[in-house]
Amino acid sequence: MDKEECSSSESGWTTYLSSPIKVDEDEVVDEDYYYEGYNIYNYSSKVEHEEERNKDSDDSMASDASSGPNYQRFHQKNKALDLKNGKNEGNSKSKNDDDHHNHYHDGKKTSNSYRKKDKKKRENKSTYRMK
């Protein structure tokens, strides 16, 4: 069959033949050029969509659970230590927690705010004595 005797259209990998028609040579489209342009367009739009999706997610390059943020690993490590030391989630506060957060040392508070107040008291006492 000659090209001028029938027309065809492509859909995916399948070629459909239709009834014979007369084709003007001016209207003949270079199929290789058309499909090459189509493939380039599809590829570039696919890349744009992937880039857009990746903008929303900062952890798109994360390969495993151990590559998460440091604070999560620190929190999980402390939780594991608490469970190992006999603390459970329902009773997460203990005397050791108080000691750690309030900085008890030899029965005295040594937190920054307490030290500042104590320093003011000592300064007031020393100025009172000097007068």
UniProtKB/Swiss-Prot annotation:
Top-level taxon: Eukaryota
Motif Nuclear localization signal in this chain: 107-114
Ranges of Polar residues composition bias in the record: 8-18
Tissue expression pattern: Expressed, at low levels, in seedlings, roots, flowers and siliques.
Annotated region described as Disordered, given as residue ranges: 1-21, 40-131
Main location: cytoplasm
Annotated GO biological process: cytokinin biosynthetic process; cytokinin metabolic process; cytokinin-activated signaling pathway
Entry's localization field: Cytoplasm; Nucleus
Keywords of the record: Cytokinin biosynthesis, Cytokinin signaling pathway, Cytoplasm, Nucleus
Regions of compositional bias (Basic residues) in chain numbering: 114-131
Compositional bias (Basic and acidic residues): 46-58, 79-109
Entry's Gene Ontology cellular component terms: cytoplasm; nucleus
Position of sequence motif SOFL-A: 11-16
Motif position, SOFL-B: 60-69
InterPro entries named in the record: SOFL
Record remark: domains: Domains SOFL-A and SOFL-B are required for function in cytokinin-mediated development.
Family listed: Belongs to the SOFL plant protein family.
General function of this protein: Involved in cytokinin-mediated development.
UniProt protein name: Protein SOB FIVE-LIKE 4
Species assigned in the record: Arabidopsis thaliana (Mouse-ear cress)
